[in-house]
A protein has these predicted regions:
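Acidic/histidine-rich alpha-helical segments that form the ligand environment
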Residues: 101-141, 155-161
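Short, contiguous alpha-helical
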Residues: 4-9, 14, 18-21, 25-47, ...
């Protein structure tokens, strides 16, 4: 495995095989493939970590890898199931008073085992893939409006999910390195 700048690194953690996006794919295929690549990156950053490591913050930030994973599960479900399809929130999100505790998913992730967090995220991603596959196309608008009554196209939602997941994959890079010195893609 290589580290920064293509040099071999003894500090690289085991990375699951990630699917490279097909450069000849359609717009819809590329958006889905780039999102999957980022999802796989985030999951790889949690490989081999125990509950204490997943819940360990690295000051001055309060972020944890477990919190990021739980947050990304919420983001997947919220954008594609709740906003795009108009479905009600699933548990545990449905019972949360977000006004009183806006960082609930970050705070409560420490109570869950690493595999529970990974499984929740994988299941949310699987359901998201199904929503995208069953949509009429990238121009299909969300059922639930937001921001002054505006509705979101599936294209916008996928781009937003790529941006959000990639941003948190970058956070996960730093968090993982702070935990055990591992670096990698």
């Amino acid at each position: 495995m290589t580290g920064r700048f293509g040099r071999p690194s003894e500090r690289c953690h085991t990375v699951q095989v990630r699917s490279e996006p097909d450069p000849s794919g359609s717009e819809a295929e590329l958006l889905s493939q780039y999102l999957d690549y980022q999802r796989e990156t985030v999951l790889a950053k949690t490989d081999g970590l125990d509950q204490e490591q997943m819940a360990r913050p690295h000051p001055p930030s309060a972020l944890t890898l477990g919190g990021l994973l739980y947050h990304l599960a919420l983001v997947e479900e919220n954008w594609l199931e709740v906003r795009f399809l108009g479905l009600p929130d699933r548990q545990p999100w449905a019972g949360v008073d977000w006004e009183a505790d806006p960082d609930w998913e970050f705070r409560t992730s420490a109570e869950l085992e690493p595999e529970q967090l990974r499984q929740r995220y994988r299941e949310a991603c699987d359901r998201s893939r199904l929503v995208v596959a069953q949509a009429s196309g990238l121009d299909q608008l969300s059922v639930k409006p937001l921001r002054g009554g505006r509705r979101f196209s599936l294209r916008w939602i996928l781009l937003h999910l790529i941006e959000e997941t990639a941003r948190h994959a970058g956070h996960a890079d730093f968090l993982r390195e702070a935990i055990d010195g591992s670096v990698g893609e």
